């Protein structure tokens, strides 16, 4: 289990890619950072996974002072990805618990030696730059096999740079048995319960999509399950929490990460719209399930 201040602590998180409709990777204001963090806290979440991006320093400052935990991704690299492998086949192999070694440089799009060294240099800079933010509790070097390589060496390197924090070595799949967290993504198939001597985390789930036309940037819709009303979205979220997510805690899961904080272009699977004008699910229902999720750790 995760502990915070020597007490068991369930981390109920949200995937946060840090996009805004006017500036994309640039927030419109300092208040925009505060709004996103506070909105997630008000819904009952206590952790944000900053996904595929290093945020402006002010964002981490606000997480520090507002009491929001952070899992920090290293932005992914490598050459063009083989989606049939790192997306479709990987989902099936992950569900079947068939291990895949990170030696397949071509399949994992990491054949370039210069690119691998550049990654090491950049992750060193990231850890050193963000080291003094107490909100950061976990480093995430690789996500879903995107440019993954030498996972154990990279994990050991991060631990040497920063022995005070945890490392989620491979979020999603292609686990190499190293790091502090056994980290899975769940979208389509049954949620596995692997035997592990590491902390078990559901580092992505959900992806439920509802497009509100007057608050969307694109006509296209991307999501793993699509809805046309807030009521239907909320009901399906409740069933997922009741039947799968909350029961997973007694099976050892100690953290969850819902996808995602806000809509992003055609990704209409956010808790709030791209323009931050609408919360798409009933806030009281989301709060209720977050409370049950955290309490289930002690039941």
PLM region spans:
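N-terminal carbohydrate-binding accessory modules
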Residues: 1-40, 61, 193, 286, ...
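Catalytic domains of carbohydrate-active enzymes, especially glycoside hydrolases
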Residues: 32-51, 56
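Substrate-binding/catalytic cleft of secreted carbohydrate-active enzymes
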Residues: 47-285, 289, 296
């Amino acid at each position: 289990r995760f502990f915070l201040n020597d007490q068991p602590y369930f981390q109920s998180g949200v995937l946060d890619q840090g996009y805004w409709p006017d500036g994309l990777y640039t927030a419109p204001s300092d208040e925009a950072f505060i709004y996103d963090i506070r909105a997630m806290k008000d819904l009952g979440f206590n952790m944000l996974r900053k996904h595929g991006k290093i945020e402006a320093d002010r964002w981490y400052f606000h997480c520090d002072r507002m009491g929001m935990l952070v899992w920090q991704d290293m932005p992914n690299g490598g050459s063009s990805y083989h989606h049939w492998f790192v997306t479709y086949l990987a989902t099936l192999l992950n569900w079947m618990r068939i291990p895949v070694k990170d030696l397949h440089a071509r399949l994992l799009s990491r054949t370039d030696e210069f690119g691998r060294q550049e990654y090491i240099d950049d992750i060193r800079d990231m850890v050193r730059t963000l080291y003094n933010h107490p909100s950061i509790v976990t480093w995430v070097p690789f996500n879903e096999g995107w440019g993954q390589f030498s996972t154990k060496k990279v994990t050991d390197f991060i631990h040497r740079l920063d022995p005070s924090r945890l490392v989620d070595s491979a979020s999603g799949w292609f686990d190499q048995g190293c790091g502090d967290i056994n980290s899975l993504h769940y979208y389509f198939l049954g949620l596995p319960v692997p035997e592990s001597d590491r902390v078990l985390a559901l580092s992505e789930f959900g992806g439920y999509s509802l497009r509100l036309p007057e608050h969307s940037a694109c006509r296209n819709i991307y999501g793993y399950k699509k809805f046309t009303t807030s009521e239907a979205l909320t009901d399906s979220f409740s069933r997922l929490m009741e039947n799968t997510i909350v029961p997973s805690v007694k099976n050892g899961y100690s953290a969850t990460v819902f996808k995602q904080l806000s809509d992003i272009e055609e990704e209409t699977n956010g808790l709030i719209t791209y323009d931050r004008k609408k919360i798409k699910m009933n806030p009281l229902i989301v709060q209720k399930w977050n409370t049950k999720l955290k309490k289930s750790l002690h039941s």
